[in-house]
């Protein structure tokens, strides 16, 4: 079976140049935003790979070309490999290594795995220190959170089992017990690497918090208590003019913190009780989705105190997702309502519905993976492993449907023309054969 193309040195130069150009492109929903608001991106070589949840953009947007847009369980498959255990975390990639988390023995054993990008071989398998497993929803897993890496260490969160850092050879660097999670669905939010800090929040029944840990040692840099009782999202770091903000979208409130000190900057009311999607940014706004029936909020960051009456640009319940995160591209915000298998295209500036269509047969909670944008196309994968490929823009156009033939809850990773897709039992590399 064909192998993944080798990584060539000149690809780094091309990717850095491309990323720089994209940062200067104000018309798109990524890079340097025309409103002076943009996602804090990885340093150095992090732009070249897929080092975190939703990739270097943090928003599920792929900027380079050469990826196939058609596949099946046999077509354009470069390799397949079995993944031990169970988990819904997405792959992350650095250099020639892929990293995943997994759970075995009914959650009593949680691990970080490393695979070879070239052929899918399992390189190493490292367990987190022993601990008590918490309750998780039957669609969740103790290995739901996607790891992150800075090219020196891989950082993974396992809920009640704590935070783990290993080097790229699989040697344990540090482990932190962050307390037991009690939020009735189990862990899910992924850690965020910001400068030399690992930031994560855990909203639960008593003792909710957001914290920053020293990436090198695991020691606490700061910790801020929170009031939310449930929440499963991933924080984002954004640049707003001359300063950075840490955005936490959770139960009832969207809150902004100083990522250096943990001090709250502002809060905006209007979210529902259950919040899973990761916020995205574009056009000077932060877009936050909540709950099984919305709403989605568009907030102008940079305020202070309660900004509900001053910085909430628009609010809608049209097409809001429960699990999948939205994606913004150009002038449009795309959301996938997994409660009814409906994709909605909104005008990002106004919140008005541009189009709304159903993808396949309606199924309650039938889509878990977050959508990605590749080559001006929107890719939406349902739990059955069907990927709907749509043209981006103001008109709905379904190009085709790819069926990988396996249950798929994890979001993909994309590097050097290859899709890396985690199914329920396998890791699959999809490229142009």
Over which residues does each language-model region extend?
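N-terminal secretory signal peptides that target proteins for export/translocation
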Residues: 1-13
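Bacterial N-terminal signal peptides
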Residues: 15-27
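Generic alpha-helix initiation/capping and coil-helix boundary signal
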Residues: 10-12, 19, 272, 405
């Amino acid at each position: 079976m064909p192998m993944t193309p080798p990584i060539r040195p000149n690809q780094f130069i091309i990717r850095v140049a491309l990323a720089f150009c994209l940062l200067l492109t104000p018309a798109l929903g990524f890079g340097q935003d025309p409103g002076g608001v943009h996602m804090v991106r990885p340093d150095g070589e992090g732009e070249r790979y897929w080092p975190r949840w939703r990739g270097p953009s943090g928003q599920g947007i792929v900027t380079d070309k050469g990826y196939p847009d058609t596949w099946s369980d046999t077509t354009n498959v470069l390799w397949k490999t079995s993944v031990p255990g169970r988990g819904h975390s997405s792959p992350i990639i650095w250099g020639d290594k892929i990293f995943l988390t997994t759970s075995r023995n009914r959650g009593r054993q949680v691990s970080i795995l490393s695979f070879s990008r070239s052929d899918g071989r399992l390189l190493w398998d490292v367990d987190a220190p022993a601990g008590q497993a918490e309750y998780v929803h039957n669609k969740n897993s103790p290995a739901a959170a996607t790891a992150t890496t800075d090219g020196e260490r891989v950082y993974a969160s396992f809920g009640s089992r704590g935070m783990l850092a290993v080097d790229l050879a699989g040697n344990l660097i540090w482990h932190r017990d962050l307390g037991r999670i009690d939020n009735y669905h189990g862990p899910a939010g992924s850690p965020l690497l910001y400068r030399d800090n690992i930031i994560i929040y855990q909203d639960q029944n008593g003792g909710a918090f957001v914290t920053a840990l020293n990436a090198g040692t695991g020691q606490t840099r700061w910790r801020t208590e929170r009031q939310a009782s449930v929440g499963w999202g991933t924080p984002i770091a954004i640049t707003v003019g001359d300063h950075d903000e840490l955005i936490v979208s959770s139960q009832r409130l969207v809150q902004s913190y100083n990522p250096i000190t943990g001090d709250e900057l502002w809060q905006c009311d209007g979210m529902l009780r259950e919040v899973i999607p990761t916020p995205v940014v574009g056009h000077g706004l932060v877009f936050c989705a909540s709950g099984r029936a919305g709403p989605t909020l568009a907030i102008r960051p940079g305020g202070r105190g309660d900004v509900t009456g001053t910085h909430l640009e628009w609010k809608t319940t049209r097409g809001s997702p429960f699990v999948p995160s939205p994606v913004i591209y150009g002038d449009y915000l795309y959301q996938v309502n997994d409660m009814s298998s409906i994709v909605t295209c909104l005008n990002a500036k106004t919140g008005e519905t541009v189009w709304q269509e159903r993808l396949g047969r309606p199924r309650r909670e039938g889509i878990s993976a977050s959508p990605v944008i590749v080559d001006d196309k929107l890719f939406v994968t349902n739990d059955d492993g069907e990927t709907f490929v749509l043209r981006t823009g103001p008109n709905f156009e379904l190009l085709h449907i790819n069926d990988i033939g396996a249950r798929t809850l994890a979001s993909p990773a994309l590097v050097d023309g290859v899709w890396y897709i985690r199914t329920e039992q396998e890791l699959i590399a999809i490229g142009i054969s």
